[in-house]
Amino acid sequence: MNVQHEVSLLVGEIQRLGSKNADGQTCVKFGVLFNDDRCANIFEALVGTLRAAKRKKIIAFEGELLLQGVHDNVDITLLQE
């Protein structure tokens, strides 16, 4: 699977699991995304896909690296629907 395809799948999963914030952008907590069974089956390296999407300015989140447990409450915001 190529990175662009995984990023597009990630956008769909954020839209499925997330909700709109005050600015009208879709947000989801990292823990919700990480612990979702469907996401676990789709993404071999979820954190790598998140970093690739962040570099492409498709999503935004605080920090550079998200770790399970430690960063479960970090918001991932979809910048491009």
From Swiss-Prot:
Gene3D superfamilies in the record: Costar domain
Protein name according to UniProt: Costars family protein ABRACL
Annotated InterPro entries: Costars (IPR044302), Costars_dom (IPR027817), Costars_sf (IPR038095)
Organism: Salmo salar (Atlantic salmon)
SMART domains: Costars
Family the UniProt entry places it in: Belongs to the costars family.
GO biological process: regulation of actin filament-based process
Taxonomic lineage: Eukaryota, Metazoa, Chordata, Craniata, Vertebrata
